[in-house]
Curated annotation (Swiss-Prot):
A molecular function GO annotation: nickel cation binding
Gene Ontology annotations for the cellular component aspect, listed alphabetically: cytoplasm
Keywords: Chaperone, Cytoplasm, Nickel insertion
Gene from which the chain derives: ureF
Species assigned in the record: Synechocystis sp. (strain ATCC 27184 / PCC 6803 / Kazusa)
Entry protein name: Urease accessory protein UreF
Gene3D superfamilies noted in UniProt: Urease accessory protein UreF
Complexes and interactors: UreD, UreF and UreG form a complex that acts as a GTP-hydrolysis-dependent molecular chaperone, activating the urease apoprotein by helping to assemble the nickel containing metallocenter of UreC. The UreE protein probably delivers the nickel.
Disulphide linkage map: none
Top-level taxon: Bacteria
UniProt keyword annotation of Ribosomal protein present: no
Subcellular location: Cytoplasm
One Pfam family here: UreF
Role summary: Required for maturation of urease via the functional incorporation of the urease nickel metallocenter.
The family this protein is said to belong to: Belongs to the UreF family.
């Protein structure tokens, strides 16, 4: 069970008000809604469920798990040993390379950079944990989240559920503004996704390094289409 302090820090880390810019991104939803592929709460829910089960969020969360595990065993006052430095750098570069569109890559790196800067402002001693990713190298959001959660003593299970829930919450928020839908419809959808989030989290924990893949061609096409969309409210 999380301590009271860790619980509060988890709530802070997954809060929609965390200044990392998540509200600026729809991950292709804006393009899909303009094309008429998503028109109501049911089609929005179907899209988010599909992404939860087969999309790139599965890979993102799996990389967050690896960052958390690598950092979670280290005392806060110690510099990470060279194997850990190497692995963190590898997974950060690997995740950047797997992005299927410019907007999705920029989203992950912008949010990751903002979270890294925020964590350094809040907890200067976390600097050593980010040592494998120098300030000149962009940091993916999944890496920064995993390191921050581990540093704050948030256990892996709660970190993973929080990561997935905040992702779903952000997409629902974007959908509410774009379709548009009422707030109650959004809350019903978020509640409906609870079993899927719980199930997918357990599946993610079972993924080995060779199992990391996603079938997200729909997301890739939507994101690429959004890059040339004439009128846009969101950055992805």
């Amino acid at each position: 069970m999380l301590s009271g302090s860790a619980q509060l820090k988890l709530l802070q880390l997954v809060s929609p008000t965390l200044p990392v810019g998540a509200y600026n991104y729809s991950e292709g939803l804006e393009w899909l809604i303009e094309r008429g592929n998503i028109t109501n709460a049911d089609t929005l829910g179907a899209w988010i469920t599909q992404e939860l089960c087969r999309g790139s969020i599965t890979v993102d969360t799996a990389i967050m798990v690896r960052a958390h595990r690598l950092a979670g065993q280290m005392p806060k006052t110690d510099i990470l040993p060279s194997p850990t430095l190497k692995h963190l750098s590898y997974w950060n570069q690997w995740l950047t390379a797997t992005r299927e569109s410019r907007e999705l890559r920029e989203q992950s790196l912008q949010m990751g950079g903002s979270l890294r800067k925020l964590l350094l402002d809040l907890e200067p001693t976390v600097q050593s944990w980010f040592e494998p990713i120098p300030p000149t190298e962009p940091c993916n959001y999944a890496i920064a989240f995993g390191l921050g959660a581990a540093f704050w003593g948030i256990d892996l299970h709660q970190s993973g559920l929080g990561y997935l829930h905040s992702w779903a919450n952000n997409l629902i928020s974007a959908g509410l503004r774009l379709i548009p839908l009422g707030q109650t419809a959004g809350q019903k959808l978020l509640l409906h996704l609870t079993p899927t989030i719980l199930h997918q989290w357990q599946q993610i924990l079972l993924l080995g390094d060779d199992d990391l893949y996603s079938c997200s061609w729909g997301l890739a096409l939507a994101s690429m289409g959004h890059e040339s969309q004439y009128t846009r409210l969101f950055r992805s």
